Amino acid sequence: MKEQLIATCIVFLLTLGFAGRGTCQEIPSTDYDAVKETIEQSIGWAIEKDFDAMFRLWDENMFHFWLFSDSLVVGLDSFKVYAEQWKDPDFHGTRFEFKDLRIVFSSSGDVAWYSCFLDDCGSYKGREYCLENVFQTGVLEKKNGRWIHVLMHGSYPVDKIPENYVRRFYSNLFEKKEQL
């Protein structure tokens, strides 16, 4: 009986060892800090308005979809056109914060994906505004020794859409129901 128990334990431990191979790495890799910095600079670039530095953070075949339907951008060339709006001298990034940032690496170690809640603040014509608690996700790939974004998505959970957006984009829906 003792031999069977030992054999069962050995088989179980070997099974765990093989089952763990090829899975994702939730333990920080040696690239964790580089990935985190790339994620942070994808928003933080706006404080210095360094467009060249920002564009280096993105892959040629990148995909970007932010809060509004007109923010769907595919490809770096299209992203450069989309970014023209941020060249307005009255626009400035002021501060940002990533909360609950979670980064996971692929088993090969050359792909990372993340999620967080983002506060992204800027000013326009001297008036500050903030996007708070945006649920942000993204995928980065390591190419030629550098981590770059291939996908970024930002949204609000449907139960946490800020009231000013509900009023701005959905007020007609509520007015129609009230008239019925």
Short names for language-model regions:
Residues 42, 54-55, 62, 75, ...:
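Hydrophobic pocket/interface hotspot
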Residues 63-77, 87-92:
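A short gly/proline-enriched turn/hairpin at secondary-structure junctions
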Residues 58, 68, 107, 116-120, ...:
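A mature extracytoplasmic/lumenal domain signature
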Residues 1-26:
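Bacterial Sec-dependent N-terminal signal peptides
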Residues 80-128, 180:
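Surface-exposed, charged secondary-structure patches
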